[in-house]
């Protein structure tokens, strides 16, 4: 029976609010009512959501100052978003985190540029060596002894013992 009474009470409160809203909205002087209701709803929601959150955070956190600061910054950022601003309030910790992230990214970019520069220098040196090998140098007379394989040929007089080492020798076998 108690639950039924609570349900009737809730329904009567909703009916009362609806009738009140209809009478207010019929009045032409209340053109800004939806905006006022919107702001009040947001403030009420923030109030109801932030107080228990702050209590839990303060009990469980070791550093209550940072928690309070973070909650206040979050509330103000929410209000700024609701007002249509794109800017946000940031704490020093967030700024330091963002700066560290930017510095890390810059270091990574510099390392990549250094690696690419080193590779490009190596490629240029390799291309220079290839070019130097491909460049034809003009010579007055071409030595053809290399081409016909006669550079190291010796005549009979030039051999040390005076006989041709490539000539077959007589071999006798014992029977």
From Swiss-Prot:
Residue numbers binding Ca(2+): 120, 123
Segments on the Lumenal face: 1-28
PTM notes: The N-glycosyl content is primarily Man(9)GlcNAc, with a small amount of Man(8)GlcNAc.
Alphabetized Pfam families for the sequence: Rota_NSP4
Compartment(s) where it occurs, according to its Swiss-Prot or TrEMBL record: Host rough endoplasmic reticulum membrane; Host membrane, Host caveola; Secreted
Chain segments annotated as transmembrane: 29-51
Positions bearing carbohydrate: 8, 18
GO biological process, one term: symbiont-mediated activation of host autophagy
UniProt topology in membrane: Single-pass type III membrane protein
Cysteines engaged in disulfide bonds, as pairs: none
Domain of life: Viruses
HAMAP family associated with the record: ROTA_NSP4 (MF_04091)
Assembly and oligomerization: Homotetramer. Interacts with the immature particle in the viroplasm. Interacts with host CAV1, early and late in infection. Interacts with host integrin ITGA1/ITGB1 heterodimer. Interacts with host integrin ITGA2/ITGB1 heterodimer. Interaction with microtubules blocks trafficking to the Golgi apparatus.
Family that this chain belongs to: Belongs to the rotavirus NSP4 family.
Function: Plays an essential role in the virus replication cycle by acting as a viroporin. Creates a pore in the host endoplasmic reticulum and as a consequence releases Ca(2+) in the cytoplasm of infected cell. In turn, high levels of cytoplasmic calcium trigger membrane trafficking and transport of viral ER-associated proteins to viroplasms, sites of viral genome replication and immature particle assembly.
Protein name: Non-structural glycoprotein 4
Source species of the chain: Rotavirus A (isolate RVA/Cow/India/Hg18/2000/G15P[21])
Top-level taxonomy: Viruses, Riboviria, Orthornavirae, Duplornaviricota, Resentoviricetes
